[in-house]
Amino acid sequence: MSLLLEPSPTMIKEQKMYRDMGLTDEEFAMIERILGRLPNYTETGIFSVMWSEHCSYKNSKPVLKKFPTEGKHVLQGPGEGAGIVDIGDGLAVAFKIESHNHPSAIEPYQGAATGVGGIIRDVFSMGARPIALLNSLRFGELTSPRVKYLFERVVAGIAGYGNCVGIPTVGGEVQFDAAYEGNPLVNAMCVGVIRHEDIQKGIASGVGNTVMYVGAKTGRDGIHGATFASEELTEQSEQKRPAVQVGDPFMEKLLLEACLEVIHCDALVGMQDMGAAGLTSSSAEMASKAGSGIELNLDLVPQRETGMTPYEMMLSESQERMLLVVKKGREQEIMDVFSKYGLEAKAIGRVTDDHMLRLYHRGEVVAEIPVDALAKDAPVYHKPSQEPAYYREFQTMEYVPTVDNYEETLLALLSQPTIASKEWVYEQYDYMVRTNTVVAPGSDAAVLRIRGTNKALAMTTDCNSRYVYLDPEVGGKIAIAEAARNIVCSGAQPLAVTDCLNFGNPEKPEIFWQLEKAVDGMSEACRILETPVISGNVSLYNETNGEAIYPTPIVGMVGIVEHVDHITTQAFKQPGDLIYIIGEAKQEFGGSELQKWLTGRIFGKAPTIDLHVEVKRQQQLLTAIRAGVVASAHDVSEGGLAVALAECVMSAQGLGARVEMKGDVVAELFSETQSRFIVSVKKEHQQMFERLVQAVRIGEVTNDGTLHVTAEDTCILHVPVETMRNVWKGAIPCLLKSKD
């Protein structure tokens, strides 16, 4: 589109063309008042992306304020590219999780790949070297041809990008439920390490300083990507494929290394990724944070397509681009660094003192907007909230299953895609590149050593969205608690949280109620577990033709292993070790894998959780691990104790377990009661372990390669470990190969 063909401000208003960009009538009227005139086409587009939910959090901001964001280790909370936490020795860890759901539903390979690329840039824009990637994925049932296609292409996209950049993908989770049939979730997390003195911020300060553009040239891909991410998916969404960006991981690698070198150059003032809303968001946000203004000459923006308009250049979300602010007169120093990597750093503007975003094109001013109106003063909506009818109904329902054949039930649960081995997924990822990975994918948390120290980092992503659906507040608490449980089982102290809040349309009161209650639960858990929220992302409008996903607040958590000797895994270690269970089982089957397998649906009450009990048990276990008396540790989660035991023996080689159950055997084996751990201990450490931890001994590790469970001196389950392993490992590959 040429400038001559762009609609006039009057046409935009009279024909309500702004609605197609995602703006409401009231918002357009606000823009008129802010500018004191009608906005032109470029300005309307700029407001539309910056006031989208994806960029402004206009629907979720009142809820997000509930999160605790400060703590003794926090160096940088929400508001920058990533949060940062101190880990001692002058080092810090930077991390963040973000969604790329809508693009992945339309073009799964590039949608997932560019999600990885974007989160990597968020971390290295802070000055941190990315050391690990994780992801949290949700798909519909794996029996659907469409779901198989999305699953295979999303995993390929994550692998293709991460492997090429050379950052190990070390962990994550994949779950399958019909609620995600039309709207998969692709949440990507990146973790980086940084020295305190190298921390950068995305600010445009210093009047007269130069604004520089670095990285890939600007094309028309991703235009209105932020707006696209702020609306429901429909049958027409497939036509918006151009809104999905295309990534180049080799360019990303060069950009990463160049940016990590340039942070040591005194000429650099600030640096930010051109992510959602591209050049618009990076320039406006950097100026707003600094209390300055910014002028850009769009004729100087590197373009890979001819005839691009200001609207297209400002709204493009082409990947692998960074915006830098550099001290005036020292541009050559910056250019020399990037030139070493075959990259061009180009001056495209300057910092001003008038708090305006001013754009020039062909010698004319084509946009003039107050930066705070874009970056800080978007409208904020306090949406109505209403408890859904299903929730009241579920609170009155009791579900107590009957199990006739324990072996058949365990093998059936191990074959459920959500529980089954994800080896098919993570074997496509290079999780050992850079050789720092100590605990690879498949355990409670991934663990990476920190070179030059005796410390290590544990990291995980977690959320059982079924629990959040049944009871958002309780489910929110459990999401935080389970993440911390996984960190502790690895021998680490939980430090902080990054979250990705994936929900449906917030304009529906029942959906907003889910969001509000989930955040209430998460916030309470974060306060009690002392894990502040330091970064995150909100992804709303996850609906397909009016049907919402399960509310899915993904929790990314990082913990510190004070000494590598404390690193613990779930695998049983040697015959004769004693097996303990921490925590008692209750008849809690709402949202459980057993309920889904037996009934084909999810209903009833979510498991309860006492956060003070949770903290006490985690602290006791971590103390025992640090005392060197724990051989293995694993949390009891999906599928209950039976599945947890199976995972402990399947993770070992040639070992088995003999366990005695007492009380309600179905609840003991298959209930998903919270705050429970399965631990193995050497016999010589028995007394010290029992002094440190309240736990019940239930059996011991054997060398016969079977899982043997008795109740009242009667064998109720006797399964060869190899049989379990074959079912568990083969489930997902078999489903992918099956013809529907």
Swiss-Prot record:
- GO biological process terms on file: 'de novo' IMP biosynthetic process
* Top-level taxon in the UniProt lineage: Bacteria
Which controlled-vocabulary keywords does the entry list?
ATP-binding, Cytoplasm, Ligase, Magnesium, Metal-binding, Nucleotide-binding, Purine biosynthesis
- Family matches, as CDD domains: PurL_repeat1, PurL_repeat2
Provide the GO MF annotations for this entry: ATP binding; magnesium ion binding; phosphoribosylformylglycinamidine synthase activity
Look up the EC number in the record and give it. 6.3.5.3
Reactions catalysed according to its record? N(2)-formyl-N(1)-(5-phospho-beta-D-ribosyl)glycinamide + L-glutamine + ATP + H2O = 2-formamido-N(1)-(5-O-phospho-beta-D-ribosyl)acetamidine + L-glutamate + ADP + phosphate + H(+)
- Where, in this chain's numbering, is ATP bound? 57, 96, 499, 536
Q: Which InterPro entries match?
A: PRibForGlyAmidine_synth_PurL, PurL_linker, PurM-like_C_dom, PurM-like_C_sf, PurM-like_N, PurM-like_N_sf
One GO cellular component this record assigns the protein to is:
cytoplasm
Q: In which pathway does it act?
A: Purine metabolism; IMP biosynthesis via de novo pathway; 5-amino-1-(5-phospho-D-ribosyl)imidazole from N(2)-formyl-N(1)-(5-phospho-D-ribosyl)glycinamide: step 1/2
Q: Where in the cell is it found?
A: Cytoplasm
At which positions is Mg(2+) 2 bound? 122, 273
Active-site residues, record numbering mapped to chain = 54, 100 (proton acceptor)
Binding-site list for substrate:
99-102, 121, 245, 317-319, 539
- Residue numbers binding Mg(2+) 1: 98, 537
Q: How does it assemble?
A: Monomer. Part of the FGAM synthase complex composed of 1 PurL, 1 PurQ and 2 PurS subunits.
**Could you tell me what this protein does?**
Part of the phosphoribosylformylglycinamidine synthase complex involved in the purines biosynthetic pathway. Catalyzes the ATP-dependent conversion of formylglycinamide ribonucleotide (FGAR) and glutamine to yield formylglycinamidine ribonucleotide (FGAM) and glutamate. The FGAM synthase complex is composed of three subunits. PurQ produces an ammonia molecule by converting glutamine to glutamate. PurL transfers the ammonia molecule to FGAR to form FGAM in an ATP-dependent manner.
Q: What family, per the record?
A: Belongs to the FGAMS family.
Q: What is this protein called?
A: Phosphoribosylformylglycinamidine synthase subunit PurL
Species in which this protein is naturally found: Anoxybacillus flavithermus (strain DSM 21510 / WK1)
Its gene is: purL
